[in-house]
Amino acid sequence: VKSTNLMAFVATKMLERQEDLDTCTEMQVEKMKTSTKARLKTESSFAPRTWEDAIKDGELLFNGTILQAESPTMTPASVEMKGKKLPIDFAPSNIAPIGQNPIYLSPCIPNFDGNVWEATMYHHRGATLTKTMNCNCFQRTIWCHPNPSRMRLSYAFVLYCRNTKKICGYLIARQVAGIETGIRKCFRCIKSGFVMATDEISLTILQSIKSGAQLDPYWGNETPDIDKTEAYMLSLREAGP
């Protein structure tokens, strides 16, 4: 049900900005909307709701944090990548779900050598995470996508630690062929927290609370430091994979 509501929200918001979509992407989004409506009809026997209700619930679940098809509410910044300026849209109060599991609420721990900024690469299900702290809590995220005019699914997430309020990671969800598959993959990566797991026990715990995740009110509506974030993303892009 939650997945259906999320897809209803995403499809609707993207189609509100049809002028920003190319023909191929628009057709894929229309197909996604049609399949989501079919799923909604199938689910009506055990979770009756209207299309409008599904959209509202989908918006509440993630508050538009993963894919914001509306105009950004904060001033866009940009980074330099291979000689090109790329926009970064800073989503307001971009919160990832934390649930009530202690793995999320424990304090951050520096890397074994004490260098909290040493980057470590993790790969999981179509996403790459550059992790700069061994942090057991979950993150606030700021997202960007390099090609907003075509809504291509190539996203970068700057991760902030809940406890120290410092940048602790940089997540890239790679572009995939199907737009619906890509959006679902982004949802799973952020909602489940799988990409943040540093060991098998953490992975098991994070898996167990996937369906019961809730939004974390910790950050409120604080404004991110755009200059520091832009500089950090630029340094990561220059360093390469």
Curated annotation (Swiss-Prot):
This is Non-structural protein 1. InterPro entries: Flu_C_NS1, Flu_C_NS2. Suppresses the RNA silencing-based antiviral response in Drosophila cells. The keyword Transferase does not apply. GO terms for cellular component: host cell cytoplasm; host cell nucleus. Signal peptide: none annotated. Pfam families: Flu_C_NS1 (PF03506), Flu_C_NS2 (PF03555). Keywords: Host cytoplasm, Host nucleus. The gene is NS. It is found in: Host cytoplasm; Host nucleus.
